[in-house]
């Protein structure tokens, strides 16, 4: 795994089922191609080949390509906590330039350091802040339910990564009566929210019970509905495929 400059590597993290199939591979591949283009990294022509897990549980696979690499690098690991209530801290968001912000790239250590800071504070995740607004999570996408029933997400222009899981929910929530709006997740929006969740490939849908020691929200309706939507999504055969 590269730990140098952003243009040394591009990667994505996928969910793998017990048959070795990947969830939402087309979306992951499209994002890889987009990020690789922005980082000027040439991807291999052949598809990555994943090992079939040795258990009946889902796993995660980090699929990466180095700047000068001719092949994919794949690191598989178990899923940690998923679909749980968690506690979070705020942490300064890493910044590069407009072309690089929002890419999953080789200079990923600031995200890992944010996660470590959360763990050292006895928490589960870090919410990344730039100019007094939450722009991303250390490994998941923030979504906020306001008092009017609108779900707010930070726009990609704020510098966060466009999450694959978040995009699935963004498409499905309006049919359940939850309009989704892109905007700034400022202190007032977060403090007055009905519920704050983090969604991601590994975390699933986690309700953020507290942020920097302050309790958040009064309801669990958003987390429950999102968990139900993802359950439906992952039971659909079309969601899963072998990379190719």
Name every feature range the model reports, one short phrase each.
Residues 29, 141, 157-158, 222:
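A generic structural motif
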Residues 155-159, 183-185:
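Short, glycine/charged-rich beta-strand-loop motifs at protein surfaces that mediate ligand recognition
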Residues 24, 134, 160-161:
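Short, contiguous, pocket-lining structural segments
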Residues 164:
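Active-site microenvironment for binding and transforming phosphate-containing groups
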Residues 133-156:
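Glycine- and Gly-Pro-enriched alpha-helical subdomains that act as flexible
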Residues 1-126, 130-131, 170-244:
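Conserved alpha/beta cores of soluble small-molecule-handling proteins
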